[in-house]
A protein has these predicted regions:
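Alpha-helical transmembrane segments and immediately membrane-proximal extracytoplasmic
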Residues: 1-268
Length: 268
């Protein structure tokens, strides 16, 4: 007990302890989410795997019908929730960490996660990392609200949840920690960065315990790394980076434009 009291008295050590627990939550969220996705895929396709594999193996009518019906059902869930719920708490992780007090709406997050589950399980080509990151951050926020943490601690733990969720989803602890530090917290000071790293590493360890250490994306066996690192290849990588950045900016602008148009439309 003396050790526990010492850890709780030292704020930085206490934050590391909280980060470890949130990392475990992130790994478990990833495990349950992906298993539910596999269950939905099996019910629809009698098969499991990524969207491309399912489309290749599925019957022709299912390739078209399953994503359409899944998208309609997922949209109806969100639409029904928006009509039945009153004033909703924010669910955007960046918003609650950078501008808010770290409070995330749990109900809205769970509804959004169910919608994502149905979309992904029915073959939609959307990323799983968004829902897993959001769910882990929401659980961290709910835990902190239950214990009445101060806003500065609550924001940090929500960022740890986002880092853990992303790290577990992609088996990438460094990416999870850097994402939270750069995008959410915007600070690399050790007292903030260390908990993010701890959550990411623990979440990845829990995820690897269940799914193994294999990477999500496998490079072709024919790839020659000596050729990939010569000067000519570097020029192509430079062009690829510029093109990817421009495409990403265009995509984000397009989303913002469509959100503006949708908000003005009377149609759901």
């Amino acid at each position: 007990m003396n050790m526990v009291h010492k850890i709780m008295a030292n704020e930085e050590a206490f934050h590391l302890l909280l980060a470890i627990i949130i990392g475990v939550i992130g790994g478990l969220v990833n495990m349950f989410f992906l298993n539910f996705v596999s269950l939905i895929q099996w019910l629809i396709f009698q098969n499991t795997g990524d969207s491309a594999f399912l489309a290749q193996e599925a019957k022709p009518f299912l390739r078209v019908l399953a994503p359409i019906l899944g998208g309609i059902l997922a949209g109806l869930i969100l639409l029904l929730h928006s009509h039945l719920s009153g004033k909703k708490k924010p669910t955007n992780v960046l918003e609650v960490v950078a501008l808010g007090d770290g409070r995330i709406g749990m109900r809205s997050t769970l509804i959004s996660a169910w919608s994502s589950l149905i979309s992904i399980g029915s073959g939609a080509s959307i990323g799983r990392e968004g829902a897993i990151t959001q769910l882990t951050a929401a659980f961290a926020s709910k835990w902190g609200q239950t214990h009445e943490w101060q806003p500065y601690r609550l924001r940090l733990m929500v960022a740890c949840g986002a880092a853990a969720g992303l790290a577990a989803a992609y088996n990438a602890p460094i990416a999870g920690a850097l994402f939270a530090a750069l995008v959410l917290v915007g600070n690399f000071s050790m007292n903030l960065f260390a908990p993010l790293v701890m959550s990411s590493v623990v979440a990845t360890m829990v995820s690897r315990f269940w799914f193994g250490i294999d990477p999500w994306y496998v490079l072709p066996e024919s790839m020659n790394f000596d050729q990939a690192t010569n000067f000519t290849s570097m020029l192509w990588f430079l062009i690829l980076g510029i093109t990817s950045g421009a495409s990403g900016a265009f995509f984000l602008k397009s989303i913002q434009k469509m959100e503006t148009i949708s908000a003005k439309s009377p149609w759901p």
